Amino acid sequence: IKAKAELQELGYGVSLWSMTSYVELQRDALAVAATNRRKPRAKTQNSKLFHMFGDVTGAVIAVTDYMASLAQGIAAWMPAGFEVLGTDGFGLSESRAALRAHFEVDADAIVRAALANLYRQGLIDEEKLNAANR
């Protein structure tokens, strides 16, 4: 939520989503893909991910306190600009705040990831990237 506020303060539009289960979203997308493969003449079905993110442009940053590979499971069905930040390890810090900073899943890291992503897509210039560089 802090990263959202910081990005909005910099003038960027931000939507915040809470994903309760990356695994279930992946299962849905796989099931829809299998149905479309088995029934090529039928109307193409779309996954829940497509309904949520099919027309999204810009940076889409998935942030999890779990391993990044968990959220990476939905990458094939996400728009360009999808990037995952996760905590691939444990027991390295005395507090959650220190852990999140160590694994770069804190607000500062989210803002940096979003701006770097927008820059790589050519959606912001180097000046805007540097203006918010931390």
Locations of regions flagged by a protein language model:
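Thiamine diphosphate
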Residues: I1-R134
